[in-house]
């Protein structure tokens, strides 16, 4: 049986917490921020927990849970 490989997109965009939840991070913070308010930019810095329906699929992409 071949080795389980980590999905490279998932490795960069999602994270599995210590309790097993799957977190992602909001987009739209890297550049072109001049028209945005400070509250909007700070809000995009936070992660959010994905819906439980997506957890199983995301965990398949990260077989080692990193």
From Swiss-Prot:
InterPro entries: Ribosomal_bL35, Ribosomal_bL35-like, Ribosomal_bL35_CS, Ribosomal_bL35_sf
GO MF term (any one): rRNA binding
Pfam families hit by this protein: Ribosomal_L35p
GO cellular component assignments: cytosolic large ribosomal subunit
Example GO BP: translation
Keywords, ordered alphabetically: Ribonucleoprotein, Ribosomal protein, RNA-binding, rRNA-binding
Role, per record: Binds the 23S rRNA.
Quaternary structure and partners: Part of the 50S ribosomal subunit. Contacts proteins L15 and L33.
Database matches in PANTHER family: 54S RIBOSOMAL PROTEIN BL35M, LARGE RIBOSOMAL SUBUNIT PROTEIN BL35M
Family per record: Belongs to the bacterial ribosomal protein bL35 family.
Protein name (Swiss-Prot/TrEMBL): Large ribosomal subunit protein bL35
Source organism of the structure: Deinococcus radiodurans (strain ATCC 13939 / DSM 20539 / JCM 16871 / CCUG 27074 / LMG 4051 / NBRC 15346 / NCIMB 9279 / VKM B-1422 / R1)
């Amino acid at each position: 049986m071949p080795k389980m490989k980590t999905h490279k997109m998932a490795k960069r965009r999602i994270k599995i917490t210590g309790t097993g939840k799957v977190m992602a991070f909001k987009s739209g913070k890297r550049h072109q921020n001049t028209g945005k308010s400070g509250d909007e930019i700070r809000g995009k810095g936070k992660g959010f927990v994905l819906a439980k329906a997506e957890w199983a699929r995301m965990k398949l992409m990260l077989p080692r849970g990193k």
